[in-house]
Amino acid sequence: MNSIASRPLLSGEDLDTAIDQARTELAGLLRGSEDIVGTGGQEAVAEARTLLAALLDRRVTEAAARMDERDGRAVAAARADRNEAIAVTGALLYWLSADEAAWPEVALTFGRLSYDRYTDPWPGAESPDPDDLDAACDLLLRGARYDDADERTTLYLFLALRDRQHLLACPNDAKALMTWGRRLLMFPDAGGLGRSSLHDMLEFEPFLVTAQ
């Protein structure tokens, strides 16, 4: 699965074509799954899932950046891509062992996509599903490494933990929220929240004050 990171970034029609090809490849492998014997065949399926999930994730990211919320078809397409990416990533995560090198990155992707679905900002969104929030918090916490986490991952973790703490106060979540909030403060823009605003949040949120 290391080869995925070395692939060039695609966009537009090239990305659409790559997704269609990845879907076809994965479907072919799954149709022949009864004939797949041994680790090599299973790894081929995992590789295909990894590629398809990465491509779908990229298309969702591109769509979100330019989304016209009045375009119902574009919104529906982005949601469908995100749901497919979650399903494919979930299947991959189920297959991987937690001690495999690829597991943390897959867990982070699944957690991030789950939080995006939980906080869906587009018109016609379904009610937020707490299961998505739990998946986001739990998998981001398991997949992230404090000293190595980038700004994006740290922001997702902070926001997901904050939202879950608002729903159901939990001492462990409050402590984790403080920890990752401090990590987010290490970045110049604090993930877009602004260091001053984040600092005030960490100082004055009632459930965080009690965790300090």
Regions found by a protein language model. Name each.
Residues 2-25:
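N-terminal leader/linker segments that initiate helical-solenoid repeat arrays
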Residues 32-45, 89-105, 142-150, 186-194:
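Flexible helix-coil transition and linker loops at the boundaries of alpha-helical arrays
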Residues 19-22, 30-33, 37, 63-67:
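Extended repeat-based scaffolds of very large eukaryotic assembly and lipid-transport proteins
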Residues 82-94, 126-142, 170-187:
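Alpha-helical repeat scaffolds
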Residues 39-49, 75-83, 130, 134, ...:
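Short, charged, amphipathic alpha-helical segments
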Residues 1-7, 27, 43-73, 99-123, ...:
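Amphipathic alpha-helical repeat scaffolds of TPR domains
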Residues 15, 19-22, 29, 55-56, ...:
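The feature captures the hydrophobic core positions of alpha-helical coiled-coils
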